[in-house]
Amino acid sequence: MSIGQKQGLVEVADGIHVWLPADGSWGWSNAGLIADNDQTMIVDTLFDLPLTKIMLGEMGRVIPTVKEHVDILLNTHANGDHCHGNELVPTSRIISSVATADEMSELPPAALAAMVRRFEEDDSPLGRYIKHAFGGFNFLDITMKTPTETFTKNMSVTIGDLEIELIEVGPAHTKGDVLVYVPSRGVIFTGDILFIEGTPLMWAGPVDNWIAACDRIASLEAVTVPGHGPITGSSGAIAVRDYWVMLKNEAKIRFDDGMSVRDAVRDIDLGAFADWGESERIYLNVNSLYREFGSSEVVEDVMELFAEMGEIWEGEHENEKYF
């Protein structure tokens, strides 16, 4: 189930709004605003400052106090499309898991800006894929504002009369993924544990942590806000779980048969999951699974992984032109 393809700031429960971009592909992430009794919490910021500024303007229109003060900013994980806008949020309290805080330093915004510049005139499959994935964002002049407070496993915070549960389920997508659950409103923000109508990608793993997180989300039967894509419910979590169960099983069969990552990727039939956006992420995912299985021949270089995904993407979009 997904709740339409709305965009902008959407109210999903009393005092809870979700920021939804036009689509949930590379870098186009969701965020949230939780408000009660003049207190506010923002869940994640966006990939660049202009986008975050627009989002905060809309949030301030609905909850005017956001313009001057936000009680808590929570980053669900360390990917830049969920934290690059932190500096624009008027708050002194930024919370994440310990692992997320540590991971934020691994790919600074300046490195992304340099990567985009490097491939501006590159007409190779890798260059075209980098422009497709990241060319629509402005990574200049971002100063990373990192967490002031960290936790492991679980933490509870209060916004007004709302008790909010912060639940660490990583490592999975990244090293420190966190869910944000508001029991009294029946709403959960999943970060990138859920991609809806798009293919998830596993930077960290293990996959069993991700599967367990999906089971946990589904069991809550809450209004479910994914990191990317439309708002969903338990069925969305089950679909992502089923993707990982399928891919783990199919990859293990081919690993046991001695196939390389590249050959396994081209041999696996995604079935219904082939219709999900960014299906080329199968390469990164199988590579991560092979690492779990103990392969010594996995790709560790991120640019090489993007080159492999770009080659698959080119084959699927050979008649399209980007940027």
Sequence positions of predicted segments:
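Conserved beta-strand hairpin/beta-sheet module of binuclear metal-dependent hydrolase folds
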Residues: 10-61, 178-191
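Metallo-beta-lactamase
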Residues: 11, 109-168, 184, 214
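Divalent metal-coordination and catalytic microenvironments
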Residues: 15, 34, 44, 59, ...
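Active-site metal-binding motif and surrounding structural segment of the metallo-beta-lactamase
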Residues: 38-40, 50-96, 220
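Active-site neighborhood of phospho(di)ester-bond hydrolases with catalytic His/Asp-centered motifs
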Residues: 43-45, 69-77, 95-97, 169, ...
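Ligand/cofactor pocket segment of small-molecule handling proteins
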Residues: 153-217
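Divalent-metal (often Zn2+) His-rich catalytic cores of metallo-beta-lactamase-fold enzymes
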Residues: 181, 187, 209-271
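C-terminal regulatory/interaction regions
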Residues: 257-323
